[in-house]
């Protein structure tokens, strides 16, 4: 396999395939972004990092000027309406603030700005036009002020998730409404009562359903056919299934998305993240606790996008130690002209980021620091923008220093330095520089500092 032969697992075909762009001069990717009503939690960040990594690889293979990446912002949604009602704030105030938070937090994780970040509310005319086309083609109908997609009118519905419509009805929680012809039919447009966001349309004042937003924005910015559509696997059904139905029925001459990619979900310490378990936290929570964005990114990249990812404190501490060691090693080094072939080979093999990280470790062991720096920077690591945190680790060693001083004081009296030596050895093994003088004890985290190993200090 050559370095430029990119292979990706296509959810639609359930196979790993050689990626052949529709137009190598204009490689196009659409990724479903956040619904902006609150801070992004750690799970929201995973697709942002995964598809940022793919964006970087596509830019490396085809050239930065030949790749277009669209990641939308959903700023019209019932969750946003509910938050506005709870807080008494305007919807625009909430969506502007939370969009800003999201972009700041994702930038802190080293994600490059997408080519386009469209807000759904800026594309209402395109949504209305697409809905009109679907009605005219016999794929949608008006009922009680709603416009609904007629799922039975699209024979290929269910192909992405591999389920028949009847199976879906049996196994899914579908919204039952008297105006639906079929339980699986979904809303394209719904009426808005006073006090809710609404736009004039042929069907009265209302707002779009969730699924039509992405179909309209991707069509407007990328065309009837484009290369890659990505998102979390929780979006595979119904969101992506519905997008395919809408887009292929509105524009049957196009192919919509050629390759579909889905990242797996995130857990915390082996359990699903939830507020009830007390293990729910946002990206900003971690950043405010002093966990560098680069460390969060490194932990994310340590698991293949197709596997469930487990965020643990141990992984966080290990990532911090590795990055601190690498940053100390490459200080003053100029990066090689390109990433190491071994790292690139892993990345073009279905975005094998854990394999690429293993190759970074090998480059470090081999002393190939220019190669390490260039390769890590391709992966969004070891850049100047992501640095600064490593010079003064966010750790308080004052209690350990006081304890060692106490043990040392006792040892001077008994002439038995066994415990002093044991503590000192454990601290050094954890990457801590131990400085003892008449003035007292000073503990300084070194480049290989690993907080996880402090547990061994007795």
Swiss-Prot record:
Subcellular location: Cytoplasm
One Pfam family matching this protein: tRNA-synt_1e
Catalytic activity: tRNA(Cys) + L-cysteine + ATP = L-cysteinyl-tRNA(Cys) + AMP + diphosphate
GO biological process: cysteinyl-tRNA aminoacylation
Chain ranges for the short sequence motif 'HIGH' region as given in the UniProt record: 34-44
Short motif ('KMSKS' region): ranges: 272-276
Enzyme class, spelled out: ligase
EC number(s) given by UniProt: 6.1.1.16
Gene3D superfamilies named in the record: Cysteine-tRNA ligase, C-terminal anti-codon recognition domain, HUPs
Residues binding Zn(2+), per UniProt: 32, 214, 239, 243
Gene Ontology CC: cytosol
UniProt GO molecular function: ATP binding; cysteine-tRNA ligase activity; zinc ion binding
Binding-site residues, ATP: 275
Annotated keywords: Aminoacyl-tRNA synthetase, ATP-binding, Cytoplasm, Ligase, Metal-binding, Nucleotide-binding, Protein biosynthesis, Zinc
Cofactor: Zn(2+)
Signal peptide: none
Domain of life: Bacteria
Subunit structure of this chain's protein: Monomer.
Name of the molecule in the record: Cysteine--tRNA ligase
């Amino acid at each position: 396999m050559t370095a430029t032969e990119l292979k990706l697992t296509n959810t639609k075909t359930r196979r790993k395939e050689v990626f052949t762009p529709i137009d190598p001069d204009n490689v196009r990717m659409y990724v479903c972004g956040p619904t902006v009503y609150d801070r992004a939690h750690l799970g929201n960040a995973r697709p942002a990092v995964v598809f940022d990594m793919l964006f970087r690889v596509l830019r490396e293979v085809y050239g930065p000027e030949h790749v277009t990446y669209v990641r939308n912002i959903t700023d019209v949604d019932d969750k946003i309406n509910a938050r506005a009602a709870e807080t008494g704030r305007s919807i625009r105030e909430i969506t502007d603030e939370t969009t800003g938070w999201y972009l700041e937090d994702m930038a802190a994780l080293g994600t490059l700005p997408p080519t386009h970040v469209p807000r759904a509310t800026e594309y209402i005319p395109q949504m209305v036009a697409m809905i009109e086309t679907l009605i005219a083609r016999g794929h949608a109908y008006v009922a009680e002020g709603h416009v609904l997609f007629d799922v039975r009118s699209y024979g290929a519905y269910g192909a992405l998730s591999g389920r028949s419509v009847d199976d879906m009805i049996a196994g899914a929680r579908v919204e039952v409404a008297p105006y639906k012809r079929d339980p699986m039919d979904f809303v394209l447009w719904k009426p808005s009562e006073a006090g809710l966001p609404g736009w004039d349309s042929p069907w009265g004042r209302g707002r779009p359903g969730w699924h039509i937003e992405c179909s309209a924005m991707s069509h407007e910015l990328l065309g009837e056919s484009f290369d890659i559509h990505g998102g979390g696997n929780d979006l595979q059904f119904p969101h992506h299934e519905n997008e395919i139905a809408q887009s292929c029925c509105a524009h049957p001459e196009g192919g919509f998305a050629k390759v579909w990619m889905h990242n797996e979900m995130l857990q915390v310490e082996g359990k699903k993240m939830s507020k009830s378990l007390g293990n729910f936290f946002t990206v900003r929570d971690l950043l405010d606790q002093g966990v560098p964005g680069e460390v969060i990114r490194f932990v994310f990249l340590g698991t293949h996008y197709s596997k469930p990812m487990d965020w643990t404190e141990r992984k966080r501490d290990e990532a911090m130690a590795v990055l601190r060691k690498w940053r100390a090693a490459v200080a003053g080094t100029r990066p090689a002209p390109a990433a190491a072939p071994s790292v690139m080979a892993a990345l073009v093999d279905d975005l094998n980021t854990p394999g690429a990280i293993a190759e970074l470790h090998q480059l470090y062991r081999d002393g190939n620091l220019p190669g390490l720096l260039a390769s890590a920077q391709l992966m969004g690591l070891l850049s100047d923008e992501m640095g600064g945190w490593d010079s003064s680790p966010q750790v308080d060693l004052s209690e350990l220093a006081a304890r060692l001083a106490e043990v040392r004081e006792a040892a001077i009296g008994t002439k038995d330095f066994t415990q002093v030596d044991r503590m000192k050895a454990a601290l050094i093994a954890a990457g801590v520089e131990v400085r003892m003088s008449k003035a007292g004890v000073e503990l300084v985290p070194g480049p290989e500092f690993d907080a996880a190993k402090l547990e061994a200090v007795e």
